[in-house]
Structures are given as structure tokens and as C-alpha cells.
């Protein structure tokens, strides 16, 4: 370990944690920083505004967290039905790129271009599938979801959380705010 690494570990003791423990520390930092300040499901832009003052790395993590959940529970297109506020969409794409997930950012942008124009037609869950299938787009959404989910490496099956860990270890000053 060189002097710079030793100094960084002294300043950021959480870097000595395991990946799983570091992920918990990041979630704790996010909870303190964003907490219940704004609702990411809202269309009012408050969530994007709330994360806008965070350090760039923590901001990227706050913006991409909900995409990870969408990839796990739904699909990359459905994400925009829950988290489609334009400011949050921009923050998420920028966040993916900041975290070194350029490929996922491309899949994300393509999925947004597919789903966003159709949102006015989607009133209920069944409408989403019917709308995309009737246009031959559901297969592409599934492909984009599979590609984004399969990006390696992953932590607990998540390429996004693995990127958080890699980023936090490489740039702790852009994540931790004490």
C-alpha cells in the first residue's frame, strides 16, 4: 500500500469494509442525505432537485438506485412508469455514465425513447404490455432488460451496486460527505 492509499484509508475508514458492509454504508449515507426529503415516484421534479446538491458520486447512486430495483422487480421499460419524471431520467442516465456504466446508460436511453412517447396510452398495468406488444416493442424491452441485468461484474446480482462499490473505493471523496 502506497502513502496515498494509506492516507485515503485513514480519511475514509469505510474503505476497509467488505463490499457488503460498504454497500450498507452507502445506503446509510443516502438515507441521511436524501431520506424522506423528496419522493422519487413524484412527477414534480422534487427528487431530482433534492439529489442535485449531493456530491457527484452520491448523486449518481441516488439516481440509479431505483433503476436497480426496476431491473430486479420489473423491466427497464416499466421503470419509466414509476420514475419517469424528466429530471430524474436525466439524472439517472448521467449517473450511470458517472459510475462507469455507459452500456447500461445506452440501454436506459433506448428504453426511455421507446416507452416515453407511449406513456399517455398506459393507464393500467395491462396497458403497458398490450401497448408495447401491439407495436412489436416488448421483445426489445426484454432484450434491453436482459442486457442491463447481465452486465458484469455484479454484487448480489446487481451490476449497478457493483459499480457503486467500485466507484466508492476509487473516489470516496465524491461519495462520503463528512
What is each of the regions a protein language model found here?
Residues 2-64, 68-74, 81-89, 95-178:
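Extended, alpha-helix-rich binding/interface surfaces that flank or overlap catalytic cores
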